[in-house]
């Protein structure tokens, strides 16, 4: 099965999430082949198969050098929040996507931790919620047209709001919500089954996500 070969190839990535030249070429071939095997080839017409919480297990942005960044990696709050919050150092622990027919929600949830010692009580944990809504494209049943509208910060895993603020260098009265008006983007679900889906974004990203058994955080 193409799906089994694709997942096995992803398991062979090196410690930094990188491909060999041969592996990257093979990855592209398998993605093209798996498109025609999708059990649910028109996702916007079978939304019950799309909604829920999905965890990103692989992403690349148009070239081998940008393929497969390790899921756990160092970043900044500004980078992950589209510059809506300050450039505090954080460690991205995972990125999930949560979709619901209720309100046409299309949210990205980034779980992160602040550096050890940044909080009075040790490491602080939080989530960045990028809230968006989707609509379908009448001419393309794979396409979700998405408009992201708001960015939120929330403490998680027992971290208090004051500790999260302290860890990120935020003032006590600094807002944890920021509205946004970015250009609309779209994402094509080119493969969908009960376990995985593959998305190709309008700005060139390709993402493989696995369905999570956890309850959504943002919905």
Whereabouts are the PLM-identified features?
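Soluble ligand-binding/transfer domains with enclosed cavities or grooves
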Residues: 2-219
